[in-house]
């Protein structure tokens, strides 16, 4: 009362069928054909490689053999060397003209007014004002001018006035 062995095998899993010599030979030929096809397609260099995208004008890789379209002179020509222009230097002003420019400088006047009003300037502005005031002092010394001349004249006038008053004239 054993179940038949042939029925149980057919229902469970079938025995692996052996391939014939012809089938094995056919598979070998297919593998050899696939192996031959490895690498680039014939004529890929001339045709430009694989162009899977339909639009050739956009995003298509350029042919590396096609170069620039700019004309190249074939004869020997002398190169024209361009002279480098020196940077235009600031024109040298006379001390008198430079002093007048500094005295009429709007930025300097505005910053000095801010200082007189009690505002504090940034370090950059303060250093700029100091440099300009130092330059004004240098120019005034070169020209023989000083702020003290005006003050001395006023003091001399005051002294003379005092002397007149004391003398009683």
Swiss-Prot record:
<dbReference type="Pfam" id="PF04220">
    <property type="entry name" value="YihI"/>
</dbReference>
<feature type="compositionally biased region" description="Polar residues">
    <location>
        <begin position="49"/>
        <end position="58"/>
    </location>
</feature>
<keyword id="KW-0343">GTPase activation</keyword>
<dbReference type="GO" id="GO:0042254">
    <property type="term" value="P:ribosome biogenesis"/>
</dbReference>
<dbReference type="GO" id="GO:0090071">
    <property type="term" value="P:negative regulation of ribosome biogenesis"/>
</dbReference>
<feature type="region of interest" description="Not required for interaction with Der/Enga">
    <location>
        <begin position="1"/>
        <end position="45"/>
    </location>
</feature>
<comment type="similarity">
    <text>Belongs to the YihI family.</text>
</comment>
<feature type="compositionally biased region" description="Acidic residues">
    <location>
        <begin position="147"/>
        <end position="159"/>
    </location>
</feature>
<dbReference type="InterPro" id="IPR007336">
    <property type="entry name" value="YihI"/>
</dbReference>
<feature type="region of interest" description="Asp/Glu rich">
    <location>
        <begin position="148"/>
        <end position="157"/>
    </location>
</feature>
<feature type="compositionally biased region" description="Basic and acidic residues">
    <location>
        <begin position="20"/>
        <end position="30"/>
    </location>
</feature>
<protein>
    <recommendedName>
        <fullName>Der GTPase-activating protein YihI</fullName>
    </recommendedName>
</protein>
<comment type="subunit">
    <text>Homodimer. Interacts with Der/EngA via the last 78 residues. Interaction with Der occurs at a 1:1 stoichiometry, suggesting the dimer dissociates to interact with Der.</text>
</comment>
<keyword id="KW-0690">Ribosome biogenesis</keyword>
<dbReference type="GO" id="GO:0005829">
    <property type="term" value="C:cytosol"/>
</dbReference>
<dbReference type="GO" id="GO:0005096">
    <property type="term" value="F:GTPase activator activity"/>
</dbReference>
<feature type="compositionally biased region" description="Basic residues">
    <location>
        <begin position="31"/>
        <end position="40"/>
    </location>
</feature>
<feature type="region of interest" description="Disordered">
    <location>
        <begin position="1"/>
        <end position="98"/>
    </location>
</feature>
<feature type="compositionally biased region" description="Basic and acidic residues">
    <location>
        <begin position="160"/>
        <end position="169"/>
    </location>
</feature>
<feature type="compositionally biased region" description="Basic residues">
    <location>
        <begin position="10"/>
        <end position="19"/>
    </location>
</feature>
<comment type="function">
    <text>A GTPase-activating protein (GAP) that modifies Der/EngA GTPase function, negatively regulating cell growth, probably via ribosome assembly. Stimulates the GTPase activity of Der; a construct missing the first 45 residues is even more stimulatory. Does not stimulate 2 other GTPases (ObgE and Era). Overexpression inhibits cell growth; precursor 16S rRNA accumulates, the 23S rRNA is 6-7 bases longer than usual, and 50S ribosomal subunits are improperly assembled, leading to 45S subunits lacking proteins L9, L18 and L25.</text>
</comment>
<feature type="region of interest" description="Disordered">
    <location>
        <begin position="144"/>
        <end position="169"/>
    </location>
</feature>
<feature type="region of interest" description="Arg/Lys rich">
    <location>
        <begin position="17"/>
        <end position="45"/>
    </location>
</feature>
């Amino acid at each position: 009362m054993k179940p038949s062995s042939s029925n149980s095998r057919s229902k469970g899993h079938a025995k692996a069928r052996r391939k014939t010599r012809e089938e094995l030979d056919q598979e070998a030929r297919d593998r050899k054909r696939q192996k031959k096809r490895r690498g680039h397609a014939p004529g890929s260099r001339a045709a430009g490689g694989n162009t899977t995208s339909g639009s050739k004008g956009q995003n298509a890789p350029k042919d590396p053999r096609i170069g620039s379209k700019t004309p190249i002179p074939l004869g020997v020509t002398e190169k024209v060397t361009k002279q480098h222009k020196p940077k235009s230097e600031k024109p040298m002003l006379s001390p008198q003209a430079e002093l007048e420019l500094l005295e009429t400088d709007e930025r300097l006047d505005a910053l000095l007014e801010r200082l007189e009003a009690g505002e504090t300037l940034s370090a950059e502005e303060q250093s700029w004002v100091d440099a300009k005031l130092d330059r004004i002092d240098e120019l005034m010394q070169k020209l023989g001018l000083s702020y003290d001349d005006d003050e001395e004249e006023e003091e001399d006038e005051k002294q003379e006035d005092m002397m007149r008053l004391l003398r009683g004239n």
